[in-house]
Each structure stands twice: as C-alpha cells, then as structure tokens.
Amino acid sequence: MKEVLPLVVLCLATYHTHSIKIGISHNYNATISPTASTTTEAPATTGAPSSETVSSISTLPEAEVTTTTPAITFPPRVQQKPKVAVASPTMSTALPLNSTEVNSTLSVSGDNTFYYCSCDLQAGRCDLNCCCDNDCPLETRQVFNCLPNSLLPQLESRLEDFQYTHGLPTCQINDGWLCVFRSNTKATKTQPPDMNIDTSQYRKWKDNLEYQESDYAQSRPSAGHYKFGQTLQLWQPETKQLATLELPAAYESPNCQLKQSVWHLQPIRHVCRMKDSAQLQESIWSLLNQTSNYEILSKPRDLEEPEVNGLIVQVCLRGANKSMRCLERGNDTQLDVIVDHVELQLIHNFTNILEAKLFLEEAKLAEDDNEPLWLRYNVEFVTLNESLTKPTSGPLGYLSGAPVILSRMLPQNSSEDKQLISYHSLNQNIKEFHWLSLPSRKPRGSSCQRALDHKEALRFGIDLLTRCELRHAAPLLQAHANHTEYCQGLQAQIWSLLLPHNCTQLEDVTKVFVSHLGRPQPDKWLPMEVRYPENVHEMPPPVQAVYDEMRQSLSCRNIFLSVGYEFHVAHLAMVEGRAPHQRVLQHARLVLGQRHDLEFDTSEIEVALPLSISAMFYRMQTKALSNGAAVGIAGHLVLVEMIYLGIIYLGSMQLCL
C-alpha cells in the first residue's frame, strides 16, 4: 500500500467560507475493516462501468494493403506503377455510430460528395454575397455582390518550381550527383502572352469628370428590390416625402455627432456616450418620432407607381426581467423609462424588407451619478427561417476560431433500425446546445459560471485554461445522515461544470460525439473518449463517503476537480483536391485529473472547491515533422562534416605535394 501523502490545506478567504482539507486519493483496501469510530458508506449504484463499455466505440480496422515495391535506384527513373490490391476503404478516425454494424446504424443524407463552396459557412441558410451557395434562391444573384468562388489558392498554384525558385537545379537542366528529379509531374506548357488584358474587373480610381446619370435614373431600381449595400428608404404618407433611414454615429470620438445611413443586409453596431440622462432621453424621443411618422419601404420607390405602401415599425419595450411589452401605434412616443439599448430588427427575404421591429431595453442606472451613460444602437437583418438552421463552423473543414461542434446520441426506439445523432434529427421539438461550453470566472470574483451561448463556446485551434471556484453548502455532519448522497451530489455538481452540457456523470460522456468537419455530416462524427491516466484500461473508482464520529468530520474520497480536453487536428485535401488545406478533427479525448479526498468538519458553513479545466489542440503532423526535421538536420550536419573533412584531407594532400 502506498505511503499516505500529507494533506494539503487550502485556505479560501471568504466571509462564510472556512478551511477545507483536500488530499490526494489513494487505492484503499476494501478488506481492511475500519475503526470503531469510522463509518465507510458504499455508493448505492453498482459502480463505474468496465472498460468494455468505453471500448465499444472503437476504431475500425484499417484496410489491408498488399504492395509490391521494386528496387530503389538513385537517381530514380521512370518505372511502372506497382500493382496495389486495396480492400474497401474505411474510416479509422471519423467513426460511424456503431463500429460493429456500420451499414445498419448510419443515416446517410443526400449525395453532397462533390459539393464545395468556400463561402458557404452556414448549413440550411443563405450566406450573404455567396452566389455558389445551394441554399440561396436564384433571385439573390440579382441582389448580391458575388464573392469569388474560392478564396484559397488552387493546388496547381502550389506546385513548387525547382528549376528557378530554389538553389538546387533540376536534373533536366544540370544532371549531377545533387539535383532534383521530378518524374511524376506533367510537362510545363508555355502559353503565349495575352495582349488583350481585360481590366474591367479590377479596382480603379474613380473618374470625377465622368458623366453621371441623373438622380431619377439612379433612384429607379431595375428589378424592384434592394441591392446589397443600398440605402434603406423611409416614406412619409401624409406629406409624400422620401427620406433615408439614418442612425447616430461617432467618428474619432465617443460622442455621436454624425449620421450614418442604414444599408441593406449590412448590420450596424454603434455606442454613443451621453452627457446626462436628459440627452439620453432626447435621443430616444427623436428616434421614436422618426419611426412613428415614417414608414420603411420594403423596396426602393418606383416613381411610376402611383401608390406607395410602407411598413410600420413595431416598437417593443424589454424590461429588466427580460419581459416584453409592445406599444400601440401612436402611444409609442410616450416613454417614461430610461433606455440604453436600441435594436432595430429587419426581417427580410434578401430582396425585400418584410417586417420591422424596434426593441428598447430598459437601462440599469448606477448608484454613482458621475458614471457616464452610454446608448447602444444595433441593426440586425434576420431571415425568416434563421432560427431553424443548424450551426456550422466552416464551409467544409473548421475555420480557425470557429466553435467546436458537439452532439449526442439519441435514444433508440425498438421500431427504429438506425441510431441517429441529435444534430441530424428532423424533430424541431428537440432543443439542444451543439457547442462545448466551458465554465468561466465571474467578472467580480472567482466563482464559476457557465452560459449556454456560442460566444462562450470553445473555439477551434485556441488553447484555453480556466481556474475558478465552486461554492457549495457544507454537509450535515450527523451519524445517521446519508453522507454518500452528499458526496455523490457534490461530484455531480462538479461534473455539470467540467463535462459537456447535460452531463452529470462520466457515463454520459460516452454518448457525446464531436464533429469531424466544420460542416457536420451524418457519418463524420468522433466519439468523445474518456481517459483515466492512473489506469487506462478501467474507469475510476466510485465516490466514497467516510464519516469519523470521533473527530466529527466527513471525508469524500475519489473526487475529481480538474479535467482536460485534447483534440488532434489534421490538414487534409478533400473533395478530390478541390478543397485543399481543410482543418479537421481526428481524435477527441477527455483526460481526467487527479483524484482527491475532501475532508469537512463542523466549523464549515459553506465550502469553496478550486476547479481547473483546460483545452488543447494538437497537430497530428507536428511531431512527425519535428522528428523528420531533426533527422534532416542531422543528415545535413553529417554531410557538411564529411565535406569539411574531405576539404581538410585534400588540403593536407596539397600541402604534402
């Protein structure tokens, strides 16, 4: 039995918090009977699952490859391709939902194998100015300023030319003992220079002397819809006056002294500093007078149309308790509350504005009158089916800084033959958070908090380390109390902060899957592996409660206070090379920290436990590249040493001669 290490006393300085002893858990012998004053309570459950449960989602066996390799000669010469017998391809990293029955457990959607659009970042939703997006209707091409089809360099442009751009010549030019031999590349084709260069698509300086069309021709739309970036128009039905929708803006100053027009499909976020509450109230009244007297045109006005129909802006007030109260037309200018946040929400179908709503959020005034007041303006463009879309983190692979996508296995009914991931479920009643939300520290304190918001989710490629405290009520130290229930509840509350969302025990992690791609596909999900470093073949021992009647103390054994997430990243070329350098996840792992023993006494009213959580992203090629670079450097050093010794030897021969 290992020697018991001394307990580490962590003093948590709070007004109700007292000292708590945290020690390292050890393997206790269950056959040794405790003393008369000590009571050990076994958990009510049957214990942690065996290693068979974790290994049920395992890697598929790789395909057997039989290859005949000819003799290697230097310099290499053109040889016939060896005959390769390859079995049916399988995925050893991105696993199906059940490795034992692949064909019967996968739910395959439509064939999108050869579809790739570099600007299509959201599945089931049309992306702005992305004309190759399958989710965009044909009418949007008349509205968008189309982005290029691919923002990444093509594979052809990444072939390096060893003839002129490197120090080593090719063997075609200088066939020596040190040259580059490229036998598998196609012969370079020299094209005659094109003398007729079209520069119409390039950016140019604007010619101020060029003839400009009249205001009538510019204001008259060609197709009866807004273009991307076109100014939204207001209409006064009584005076038949046309105006533009403008909001206060600031330039090189926190005070908003300018006006900025609202452009179609372009969100706006402005923050303006106010002198006092009177100026704040005056700004709100000015905006409400504009929205009550004017209507927003759903499309630019056509001078040939006799009647103009505008959209009435609906004004709603958000209270401090997130309550919503919409005001009637005519009474929306009489507000006695102080507002510090204005949000204009425009619902559209890309070509026209369908509905307009103005949300006013009540301000929380500070006790200090000298604290400055700020007024925030937000303009959001929302599509009709935006809430029904699934989250994505890239056109195919992950974008750097995009949220890591998670999902879980749905419970399988007896009538269903296929087991589905909740991300691909068509049931709209299932509301699930598809990101890995990690706890953070409160701004004013060290307590842990967790918000189900994509802004707080783990970002791809960004390592993270968070330390915070969990505050929990002290146990009731009585001889006949259920101490095991308290210790298990304490560990469950810790797991609710350290594990993915809706996971209160380690068994729930086996149902969590991580998307292999930034644009999830039904058969490209990775299981979240649970790794216990003390014994990689078994799960950790269950939580135990030991009550010492003589000392009036309770010990919760085998408590975990820290975890670490590990993700292995690879860069692959997909879609037959048309989507190069895609960042994908190859492996996801949850590594458990060290087990601890927590000891509580009667002097404690509230306990504060230190928690730690980390997330690391590893490139799978980094280790191989670093080792290869070391070998290459060593080889170069040996070569340089041989050349150096050869020069010395030749020099000595010359001296002797």
Curated annotation (Swiss-Prot):
It holds the Pfam family TCTN_DUF1619. It is found in: Membrane; Cytoplasm, Cytoskeleton, Cilium basal body; Cytoplasm, Cytoskeleton, Microtubule organizing center, Centrosome, Centriole. Residues 651-657 are cytoplasmic. Probable component of the tectonic-like complex (also named MKS complex), a complex localized at the transition zone of primary cilia. Has a role in ciliary structure and function. Probable component of the tectonic-like complex (also named MKS complex), composed of B9d1, B9d2, Cc2d2a, Mks1 and tctn. One of its GO terms (biological process) is cilium assembly. InterPro entries: Tectonic (IPR040354), Tectonic_dom (IPR011677). This is Tectonic. Residues 20-629 are extracellular. The gene is tctn. It comes from Drosophila melanogaster (Fruit fly).
